[in-house]
């Protein structure tokens, strides 16, 4: 009731007044009730930041689905890029893990899974990489629609996963999704079904490959960060990367995707160290050599290319 307080320090109604009911519910879901339960101003503020990040992720998803019509633009799984398939594999894992956590009344695991997916799998990896496809690829190109298909599935599942703990935020998201505009869909997200895993998205081979790709990306990022720290380059798009390592077959398999994964203008697989190396780093069985990107900067995507500067080609890389 109104007189209830937690450790005589923070009143639940004060949390609701200052942060909203979803934050109080998020706190309840974040603690392991089998151990001592802690709460304080700093904890509530941290949860508020997590809430905002989740909201910003949802805003990014919705902002890039404004022109996506699932009935016309949805891309079949077989036509998705490997990175897209990896994202759906991680989404499948999230659905399975949070469902298991709820069924076992281990709500804190739900919180951990949700936070890791939003911060690590999405914001720090998938969404960071696909921005180029979303912003510069042709509006109805296969590349952009494939990415939108994944964002659509993520938004749909993530929205439902938010409902038990953050229903107000979930409702706000639902009202702006392409799915909610379909005829016959529930007026409220609360009336929709809980998400289920999709067997087609389960892809252990892709997961194994991208576990290594993530290690390679970390190696490359550390080499580039040295240049950023010394203010030799400002953006990763200003560099070209040459990589080598023990798993050459894997590197060659994804050679055409690497510049997108690294967010660099060029990426090459070669055991031969290039000339004019500005920075290098070795880790996880991989070595990355960083040089200045060759060519001229595209006005549209900011990538460097050796395409002719005549006839406006640099504005038409994508």
Predicted regions and their residues:
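Short, small-residue-biased leader/transition segments that mark boundaries at the very start
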Residues: 1-6
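Catalytic adenosine-cofactor/nucleotide-binding cores of aminoacyl-tRNA synthetases and other
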Residues: 7-80, 179-185, 230-235
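Structured, non-catalytic alpha/beta "coupling" segments that mediate domain-domain communication
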Residues: 44-70, 164-178, 249-276
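Core structural elements
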Residues: 49-62, 84-93, 112-133
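Acidic, turn-prone loop/beta-hairpin segments
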Residues: 68-96, 128-223, 230-245, 271, ...
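Short cysteine-rich clusters marking metal-coordination/redox-active sites
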Residues: 298, 314-315
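Cys/His-coordinated zinc-binding microdomains
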Residues: 302-305
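Short, non-ligating residues that shape and space the ligands of small metal-coordination modules
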Residues: 307-310
């Amino acid at each position: 009731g109104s007189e209830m307080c937690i450790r005589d320090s923070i009143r639940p109604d004060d949390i609701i007044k200052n942060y909203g009911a979803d934050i109080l519910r998020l706190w309840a879901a974040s603690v392991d009730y089998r151990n001592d339960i802690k709460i304080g101003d700093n904890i509530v503020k941290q949860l508020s930041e997590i809430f905002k990040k989740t909201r910003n992720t949802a805003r990014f998803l919705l902002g890039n689905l404004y022109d996506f019509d699932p009935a016309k633009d949805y891309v079949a799984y077989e036509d998705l890029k490997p990175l897209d398939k990896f994202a759906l594999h991680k989404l499948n894992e999230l659905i399975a893990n949070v469902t298991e956590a709820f069924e076992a009344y281990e709500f804190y695991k739900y919180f951990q899974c949700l936070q890791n997916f939003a911060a690590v799998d999405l914001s720090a990896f998938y969404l960071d990489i696909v921005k180029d496809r979303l912003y510069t690829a042709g509006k109805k190109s296969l590349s952009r629609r494939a990415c939108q298909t994944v964002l659509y599935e993520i938004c749909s599942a993530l929205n439902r996963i938010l409902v038990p703990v953050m229903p107000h935020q979930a409702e706000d998201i639902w009202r702006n999704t392409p799915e909610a505009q379909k005829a016959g869909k529930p007026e409220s997200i609360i009336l929709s079904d809980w998400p289920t895993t999709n067997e087609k998205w389960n892809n252990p081979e892709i997961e194994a490959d991208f576990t290594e790709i993530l290690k390679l990306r970390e190696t490359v990022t550390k080499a580039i960060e040295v240049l950023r720290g010394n203010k030799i380059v400002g953006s990763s798009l200003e560099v070209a990367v040459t990589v080598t390592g023990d798993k050459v077959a894997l590197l060659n398999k994804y050679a055409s995707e690497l510049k997108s994964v690294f967010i660099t203008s060029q990426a090459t697989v070669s055991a031969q160290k290039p000339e004019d190396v500005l920075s290098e780093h070795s880790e996880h069985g991989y070595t990355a050599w960083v040089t200045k990107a060759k060519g001229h900067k595209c006005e549209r995507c900011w990538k460097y290319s050796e395409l002719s500067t005549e006839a406006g080609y640099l504005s038409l890389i994508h």
